[in-house]
């Protein structure tokens, strides 16, 4: 190496390093998990390889093989690095907010909400590049396999947690900001068959409780909280809590970051 050349430095995401370390710990203590851990994590060089494998493994059909799916998804990750960055942020969000998540590898191996979100992210990227039917295929399979139906045209930010993830519906023109948390059975839907911009806009840091429905082209202000089982039909100011059917403001959100604190009590 000449004096003018700088040594190459390999930068490895610390979360990825931790995931690999956690995986090795699992094998050392639970040898019956060896095959699962090796094929799902340790055999892979990076997170994008893991995600491509896991999504292809879950979403393949007799007409769309695992190998073909893996190749297409991995190519999307290699083309758009933002997809990998967003996946890391989603993993961290789950680890920080879900008290049942003790390790970074858990979302990758066991959490269908996380996997469904990554399937959406890949589909959204491909949809934006004209591969509409493949993005619809991913949407269909994600709905069938994970019970999560996110239209590939929806816009979803970074650091998202979808907890439990049964019966999640996010419509075509919905917008979800950064650092949002939602529990199972959340619907971000329209109010009929109107076309155009017809779905909710969810601000940064919002917490959507279990069974909450937000309907129509309305705005939920940043760092607000929608109580479980509520039906929201009108705009919600920032830093407020709404509850009821139809939902009404019942107080402040109680903290600066409801989605991070995950306190579902009504203040």
Question: Which residues does each predicted region cover?
Answer:
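Structural signal for interior beta-strand "rungs" in well-ordered beta-sheet cores
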Residues: 143-250, 255
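Terminal amphipathic alpha-helical/low-complexity segments used for targeting or macromolecular assembly
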Residues: 1-141, 259-267
